[in-house]
Structures are given as structure tokens and as C-alpha cells.
Amino acid sequence: MRLYSLSVLYKGDPKVHLLKAAYDVSTFNFFQRSSVQEFMTFTSQLIAERSALGSRASVKEQEYLCHVYVRSDGLAGVVIADNEYPQRVCFTLLDKVLEEFSRQVSKMDWPSGSPATISYSALDGYLSKYQVQTP
């Protein structure tokens, strides 16, 4: 059971853009890592774009399960995990992250924000905390 990506996005007009993301690509071959990370960023944006405000969904993409939660204020979170990772845990994590993000980052910064301009550093910690260590 593994988490690969945790992203916070903003679903505004006309498109979705990434505000902050964390990735764990350590299980991939060194030469594949950047393309895997690119795929996860693209997939996260696409899924958030296709989801309605106020909705939750789980979408299978290749060998991954992508869990998306788009709040009614346009803030969205996407977790990309393997097929065995519990769906309920993913949505609990998304709830927690989006709630904390909305408290720490001003709503005025969401429409124009980018990973370089948004200061929110908790994603890497959540990604490693929610990894399930297999014995």
C-alpha cells in the first residue's frame, strides 16, 4: 500500500491550476521519476478539472487509484495511491489537508497561486506520515 502524490489545486475559471504538491517517486527507476511525476501532476489537474464543485470521486488511471475532493469554494485535493490503499483514509487525508491549507493560505492567493508562490510546507510531512510501512 503506497501513496505517490498529494496535490492541492484551485478550480477556477477557466481551468484548474496546481497550488502545491508532494510526490514520492522513490519506488520508481531513477530515469522514470521525472516522467512519473509529470504524469501525476497532469492527471491530478485533469481529474480536478472534470470533477464538479462539492464532489468526491475515485478514478482508476493505469495501475493507480486517484482520489479527488473538490470543495464548493474551488479548493481541490488529489491523492494518487496504489489500488490497495484504503479509500476512506485518502478522503480523511484530503479533508484534513484542504481544511489546514484554507486556514493557512489566504483565499485571495488561490486564483493566482503557484507552487513557487504558495508557502505551505505540510504536504511532504503528510505524504510520509500516511505511507503504510510494509513489514
Please provide the spans of the model-predicted regions:
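Soluble N-terminal interaction domains of secretory/endomembrane membrane proteins
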Residues: 1-135
